[in-house]
Amino acid sequence: MELENIVANTVLLKAREGGGGKRKGKSKKWKEILKFPHINQCEDLRRTIDRDYCSLCDKQPVGRLLFRQFCETRPGLESYIQFLDSVAEYEVTPDEKLGEKGKEIMTKYLTPKSPVFITQVGRDLVSQTEEKLLQKPCKELFSACVQSVHDYLRGEPFHEYLDSMYFDRFLQWKWLERQPVTKNTFRQYRVLGKGGFGEVCACQVRATGKMYACKRLEKKRIKKRKGESMALNEKQILEKVNSRFVVNLAYAYETKDALCLVLTIMNGGDLKFHIYNMGNPGFEEERALFYAAEILCGLEDLHHENIVYRDLKPENILLDDYGHIRISDLGLAVKIPEGDLIRGRVGTVGYMAPEVLNNQRYGLSPDYWGLGCLIYEMIEGQSPFRGRKEKVKREEVDRRVLETEEVYSHKFSEEAKSICKMLLTKDAKQRLGCQEEGAAEVKRHPFFRNMNFKRLEAGMLDPPFVPDPRAVYCKDVLDIEQFSTVKGVNLDHTDDDFYSKFSTGSVPIPWQSEMIETECFKELNVFGPHGTLSPDLNRSHPPEPPKKGLLQRLFKRQHQNNSKSSPNSKTSFNHHINSNHVSSNSTGSS
């Protein structure tokens, strides 16, 4: 039994390391899998794609790179891209160097005598920016100038881009992105844990070698528990949120027995494991502060979409290979209608906010209470209203949440104690973060005085702890309890509508990011020599016919031999070819 676990872990670790070869986990046929269609095959896509500048040229990673490549071939536009890059660097510059970096940008791009002067930013706006720089430089100094540049680029340059070979290449990438996703898209590895409707296992995309976690939701288990709306809600929320601090959904597909969510893999274990199983319970304040800041950024991204998470607790915060965290398991998250409040007594005992326990209407406030619980537990080594391994009834824990004050030990600095008390204020209207400014108000608390959130959000700060790359931070394979077989539930065609809403294939932004991170984009995104069209982009150059398989070539040779002696062999030959074609397709999709 121990051998089975060792083998499963060894295979997983080898996959995480890229298989040890030059392909870094990619299939031998990865270029064939990601072969561009001929541009003539993309005409339907060209007609139907939403031609929105922000989506095509900024939000979508592959689109952003291709628009940049287009601009770099136009002498008048190259400086605009360089300006945007310089501002992005400015925004993550340490505070003490902002003035120096700001002056550099002003001189290079916003001074008329400069060879790369940005002509489309108005003189009044330049003067206002210069005045703010002299008074006190801030991260948002060039925001209005950036908006002005984008306003210009979304005009004539964008329309020229839509007629260029770079947009044609984007259509080819979109065509690949929209290809069907099945279980054969992935290699499957060991079980990592279990969710409410099925197991979670590690998997790897054959074409790119990228590792993910596959959350399997068993169809019969969903139907038996009437969990369709909950499963679809989680999928749609994951699809909507693109944050480096929340697990991302990359693919959604179905098999005969399950619906599958393919998510960011987090190999470093959860916060509960690290709080209680790595030496003395709890963290040094510096480490707790770093995780709290990243959790706060994740909440901010969710709240930006008007989504309240409602289940903050250590086991739902996962670490990646580098020690950064992400919020996971969005099963209880819900989107709040604009200008409305919701009601729902959901969450985990000891972490639910007073307004949730009292079944009152609320907005985003429960998440700031949950953040307070997490900061307290990371520092103290136990949750604020329940001792470690304390056996106590749910009603008693709820009473403590509603009526008692948390106790602070010597482990808390004054700033840490202050932020916890302000986040654990029982009246939601008085709670830190629950005013109009939301997360921005929490970021200004003295606890985060030395945290550069711009650099944190850009992934430029080193975590205080890095997980061991040779360790598998999950239970042994045989210790993960298996689900029992679901009996008395039959699947039929009435379930198909739900399955079709769920199984939508690749999610654009994560899929495109995967192509870039695994260097597939760099290797495949090749044009003709000296900026000319590659054959697959040449409309007058017909696409190559598909290569015939061995059986087809043999049948053709047989037909040629038979045709010399039999005038009626044509029908027989067509029958052979059609039979072989069906057989070949069946094999390819298995």
Curated annotation (Swiss-Prot):
GO terms for molecular function: ATP binding; G protein-coupled receptor kinase activity; lipid binding; protein kinase activity; protein serine/threonine kinase activity. Keywords: Apoptosis, ATP-binding, Cell membrane, Cytoplasm, Kinase, Lipid-binding, Membrane, Nucleotide-binding, Nucleus, Phosphoprotein, Serine/threonine-protein kinase, Transferase, Wnt signaling pathway. One of its GO terms (cellular component) is nucleus. One of its GO terms (biological process) is protein autophosphorylation. Residues 53-171 form the RGS domain. It catalyses: [G-protein-coupled receptor] + ATP = [G-protein-coupled receptor]-phosphate + ADP + H(+). It is a peripheral membrane protein. It is an enzyme of class 2 (transferase). Its EC number is 2.7.11.16. A motif (Nuclear localization signal) lies at residues 388-395. Residues 449-514 form the AGC-kinase C-terminal domain. It comes from the Eukaryota. Serine/threonine kinase that phosphorylates preferentially the activated forms of a variety of G-protein-coupled receptors (GPCRs). Such receptor phosphorylation initiates beta-arrestin-mediated receptor desensitization, internalization, and signaling events leading to their down-regulation. Phosphorylates a variety of GPCRs, including adrenergic receptors (Beta-2 adrenergic receptor), muscarinic acetylcholine receptors (more specifically Gi-coupled M2/M4 subtypes), dopamine receptors and opioid receptors. Interacts with ST13 (via the C-terminus 303-319 AA). Interacts with TP53/p53. Interacts with HTR4 (via C-terminus 330-346 AA); this interaction is promoted by 5-HT (serotonin). Interacts with HDAC5. Interacts with GIT1. Belongs to the protein kinase superfamily. AGC Ser/Thr protein kinase family. GPRK subfamily. This is G protein-coupled receptor kinase 5. It comes from Bos taurus (Bovine).
